[in-house]
């Protein structure tokens, strides 16, 4: 099996940025993904000088940015709000380039399985504009998997006719929310995968993605799933990673841990688990 580089989400460490970078280097990962939507690491607050300083600090620890997270928590489902969200996303793409990565990941909302759904066209128009911009600067705006099945997402992407909008494959989201097979998703989305999350989880019953991803108003969202440490959920990581190898993916497996009382230990355990599968 290919020896995939391993990354970690800066925010998963739950400490300040520089401490997280230092800890990631100590754990022995090679890459970092960082949220850059609000706060000190947003485009408006990270000046050119600060971007240079941050990149130098990352490099001084032997690391690179695998991707930037540009999830604005709203998707691109509202025609009135989309122009502002698209412009903010373009600035995050610019920031990512300054940090020497060409991947920005995000959630775009739930892609309807029915192409005649009003939301489908709204999302497609937004993604078409983002794909053109990403193409123009040699980058990818990568949709995170989970809200819909991989087959529905593939059909949506095929219609864009561009790799500017691509895929950040999160196998746990697929397994937890829709119950989609992460291994088959690799093959369905093979032409678009530019980044992946190493996350695990289990689904315990039916879920409504429209409620979970707040596409419809809901005061009592039922989540019949749970994020789990790597190897303890329903993601078949050996088969999943073998599939990534099979399609020729050579990018990062970036550890994302959104729950748990000891995130540093969980990230370290996850890195060891992935290395064990790869025989490192």
PLM feature segments, named:
Residues 1-101, 135, 162, 191, ...:
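N-terminal pre-domain/capping segments
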Residues 6, 31, 68, 125-234, ...:
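Acidic/histidine-rich catalytic cores of soluble enzymes
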Residues 9-13, 35-37, 70-73, 109-111, ...:
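Active-site beta-loop-alpha junctions enriched in small/polar residues
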Residues 16-19, 57-61, 76-167, 176:
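Active-site acidic/histidine proton-transfer and metal-coordination neighborhood
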Residues 31, 103, 195, 251-252:
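Residues at the N-termini of beta-strands
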Residues 46-52, 82-90, 117-127, 179-186, ...:
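Charged helix-capping and loop-helix junction motifs
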Residues 232-246:
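A short, acidic, amphipathic alpha-helical segment used as a generic capping/interface helix at domain edges
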Residues 251-277:
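C-terminal/domain-terminus segments
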């Amino acid at each position: 099996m290919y020896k995939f580089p391993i990354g970690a989400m800066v925010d998963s460490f739950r400490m300040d940025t520089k401490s997280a970078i230092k800890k990631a280097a100590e754990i022995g990962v090679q890459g970092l993904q960082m949220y850059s939507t609000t706060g000190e690491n947003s485009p408006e607050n990270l000046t050119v000088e600060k971007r240079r300083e941050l990149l130098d600090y990352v490099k001084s620890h032997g690391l690179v940015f695998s991707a930037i997270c540009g999830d604005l928590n709203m998707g691109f489902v509202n025609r009135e709000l989309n122009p502002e969200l698209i412009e903010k996303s373009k600035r995050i793409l610019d920031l990512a380039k300054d940090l020497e990565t060409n991947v920005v990941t995000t959630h775009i909302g739930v892609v309807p399985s029915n192409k005649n759904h009003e939301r489908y066209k709204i999302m497609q128009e937004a993604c078409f504009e983002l794909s053109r911009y990403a193409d123009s600067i040699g980058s990818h705006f990568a949709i995170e998997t989970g809200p819909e099945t991989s087959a529905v997402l593939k059909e949506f992407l095929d219609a864009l006719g561009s790799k500017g909008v691509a895929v950040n494959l999160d196998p746990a989201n697929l397994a937890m929310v829709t119950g989609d097979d992460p291994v088959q998703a690799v093959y369905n989305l093979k032409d678009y995968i530019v980044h992946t999350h190493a996350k695990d989880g289990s689904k315990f019953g039916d879920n409504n993605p429209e409620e979970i991803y707040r596409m419809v108003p809901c005061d009592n969202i039922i989540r019949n799933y749970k994020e789990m440490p790597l190897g303890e959920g329903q993601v078949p990581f050996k088969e999943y990673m073998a599939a990534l190898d099979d399609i020729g993916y050579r990018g990062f497996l970036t550890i994302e841990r959104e729950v748990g009382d000891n995130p540093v230990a969980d990230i370290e355990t996850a890195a060891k688990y992935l290395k064990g599968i790869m025989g490192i």
